[in-house]
Structure formats: C-alpha cells, structure tokens
C-alpha cells in the first residue's frame, strides 16, 4: 500500500514542498530565515485578527479602542505588544534574508528574487498602513508626510493624494480605508509567499558554496524541519523577551499622544525599519528627486541579477566583494541612524554621503569587484 502523503492530492503538495523535498546537505543557519518569516506572518495574521475584533476604525474612537484592548480585553496587552513587536521581528528576518540572498548570490534565481522584491514592497505597505491605525501623533503625521510625497508625481500627483486621503487631509476616510487594506494585504502576502516558494522549488535551494548541489541532496524532513524548529525556538525566545520585558523599546513615545492635526511633533519619523529609506529620501533637497530615490532604494535590488559580473555565484571565496558587502551593511546602519536624527548639520552631510555610497556600492563597485576577482583568479 502506498503512503498517503505520496498519493493524496493535497498531502502530495505538502510532501513535495516540506517533507520529501531534496535540499542541499550544506545549507547553513542563514537559510533559516525563510521559515522564520513564515512564522512571523502567521503570528501577525493571528494577533492582527484578534486585535481587529476589538478595534474601531474611526478617528474619534481609534485611539481609545487601542487603550481599551490593552486595559480591558483578556490578554489584550499581550496581543497588542506581540503584534507591534512582531512587525519589527518580521523586518529583521526580512533584511537578514535579503542580505543572505545578496551574499550568496541567490538573486540569480531571477523569478524567486523578483517575487521576493514584490513581497518586500507589499509588506512595507502593510506595515506603513498598520502604523497609522492606533491614531497617535506619529501615526497621523507619518501618514500625512508619507502620503503627501505622492503629490510630487507630475500632473496627477495632487489629485492622487486627495484620492488616497478620501478628502483634503488625512481623516476618517483615510483611517477606514487604511484599516481595510491593512486587513487584506497580509493574505495577499501569504499568497505571494506561496508563489515565491513555487519558483524556489523549480530550481531548488542555493547553498553557501554557490555551486550545483544535485550530487549531494538530503530530504527536507527530518533534517531541516528540526533545524528550522531550533531557529524558531531561539527567535521566539528573543521575541517574547522583548514583548514581555521591553514592549515599548522600538516604538515612538509620541504615539502615546492622541492624533492632533493642530500640533506637529518636533521630529516626524517612521518606524525604525523604514529609517534607512527615509534618510535617503531626506538627503535629496528636491521633493520629486527624493521620492524617486526612496523607490529606487528598494527597486535597486532588482538590478542585482543584471549587475552580477563574477564567474562565481557566492561571495564565499571573493574577499573584495565581501569587504564591499560589509561596508554596505555598515552604510545601512548609518542611514538608519541618520533617518532618526533631525535635519541639521552634520546629519545632513552624513546622510547624503551614506546615500551616495549605498547606490555607488550596488551599481558600480560590486560589478567592478566581480571583474577584478575574475582577473585575479584568471577566470
């Protein structure tokens, strides 16, 4: 008799994706982040669903409904803190996942990579709209500033902004539609994640050496199911430590003040995971130029497969590219720091230099390093 997981139509799909999937024998802990992002998505959808049961998307009651969740709902404080910090965990895992993809040349799986970029944009949109919902000061002013950037688009810009707002300013209509979109987008993210996996399983996983691993494969279960489970337990421990001991460490104190359109906070800034892009936006004095740079800061990822000049896939044996990679990582930390600082000297200049360096490394220095390394190795 055949095993059911190999014959049943539904079980067969799960079997091919998570049980009998042939996986490279040498993939490291850096390959754990895919499953961790999946875990984050499940946590966010589950906690978000329970929050939505008690939240009201109305400008008059949104802030007090969040207060009600934290004070009066059973374990509401826990659900709210898990959801708020779950977003930070989500982006930490996403950025590490992308960094792994760049370091080990995973971007050469073009379809998987491009769906991944689409996923990043969708998750960013979801997180931005979610940040508006508590209707605190930073929620309101963040929504006002970021949506207003669209007015820089020539000809259609001003009309587009009013269309998104549903009026002449960020108000009840904006909050209601942001709640609707924030609720539906995670399910679109889940669907895109399945497409991401579908494309990945067409080619099989990459590995740290960046060479074909067809001659050395092992079944996903039990080896990588338990390896992923270890990663889940470690990350959950760190995550719950933040949630239970330091729930407000990553938030903005201004968001504990109800939204007031008549009072602007001294420093308007997004959540920490958008600060690098915000710094790039602010480093260009022109509004349209800033918006273009903001979009390109993420869209530039799509150019990685086209700019790959090395004859080796991975950076494992490429010291010049490795050096540039870690300079890029350091540069992103500097941009994140600058994004949270006021627009005044010396932060303006540091932000401009870091922004130029960001694009310079990706568009110019990485391809040149690849060619130099080919020459050194006489390939």
Swiss-Prot record:
Sequence positions that bind heme b b562: 83, 182
Record localization: Mitochondrion inner membrane
Membrane topology reported for the UniProt record: Multi-pass membrane protein
PROSITE patterns according to UniProt: CYTB_CTER, CYTB_NTER
Subunit field text: The cytochrome bc1 complex contains 11 subunits: 3 respiratory subunits (MT-CYB, CYC1 and UQCRFS1), 2 core proteins (UQCRC1 and UQCRC2) and 6 low-molecular weight proteins (UQCRH/QCR6, UQCRB/QCR7, UQCRQ/QCR8, UQCR10/QCR9, UQCR11/QCR10 and a cleavage product of UQCRFS1). This cytochrome bc1 complex then forms a dimer.
Other known facts: Heme 1 (or BL or b562) is low-potential and absorbs at about 562 nm, and heme 2 (or BH or b566) is high-potential and absorbs at about 566 nm.
Protein known as: Cytochrome b
Species per Swiss-Prot/TrEMBL record: Heteromys anomalus
């Amino acid at each position: 008799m055949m095993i059911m997981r190999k014959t049943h139509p539904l079980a067969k799909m799960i079997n091919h994706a998570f049980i009998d999937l042939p996986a490279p024998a040498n993939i490291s802990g850096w390959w754990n982040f895919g499953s961790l992002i999946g875990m984050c998505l499940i946590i966010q959808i589950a906690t978000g669903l329970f929050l939505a049961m008690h939240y009201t998307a109305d400008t008059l009651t949104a802030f007090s409904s969040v207060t009600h969740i934290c004070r009066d709902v059973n374990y509401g404080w826990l659900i709210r803190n898990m959801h708020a910090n779950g977003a930070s965990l989500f982006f930490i895992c996403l950025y590490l996942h992308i960094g792994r993809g760049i370091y080990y040349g995973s971007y050469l799986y073009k379809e998987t990579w491009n769906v991944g970029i689409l996923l990043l944009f969708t998750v960013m949109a979801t997180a931005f709209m979610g940040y508006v919902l508590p209707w605190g000061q930073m929620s309101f002013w963040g929504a006002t500033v970021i949506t207003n950037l669209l007015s820089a688009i020539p000809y259609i810009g001003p009309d587009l902004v009013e269309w998104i707002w549903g009026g002449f300013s960020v108000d009840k209509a904006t909050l209601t539609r942001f709640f609707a979109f924030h609720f539906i987008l995670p399910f679109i993210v889940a669907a895109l994640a399945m497409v991401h996996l579908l494309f990945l399983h067409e080619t099989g996983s990459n590995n740290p050496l960046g060479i074909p691993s067809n001659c050395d494969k092992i079944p996903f279960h039990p080896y990588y199911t338990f390896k992923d489970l270890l990663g889940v337990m470690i990350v959950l421990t760190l995550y719950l430590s933040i949630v239970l001991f330091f729930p407000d460490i990553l938030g903005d104190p201004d968001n504990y003040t109800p939204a007031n359109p008549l009072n602007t906070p001294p420093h308007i800034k997004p959540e920490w995971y958008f600060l690098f892009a915000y710094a790039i936006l602010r480093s260009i004095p022109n509004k349209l130029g800033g918006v273009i740079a903001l979009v390109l800061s993420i869209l530039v990822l799509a150019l990685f497969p086209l700019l790959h000049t090395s004859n080796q896939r991975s950076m494992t044996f490429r010291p010049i590219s490795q050096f540039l990679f870690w300079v890029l990582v350091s540069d992103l930390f500097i941009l994140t720091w600058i994004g949270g600082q006021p627009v005044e000297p010396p932060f303006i200049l540091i932000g401009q230099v870091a922004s130029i360096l960001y694009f310079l490394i990706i568009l110019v220095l990485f391809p040149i390093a690849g060619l130099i390394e080919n020459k050194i190795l006489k390939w």
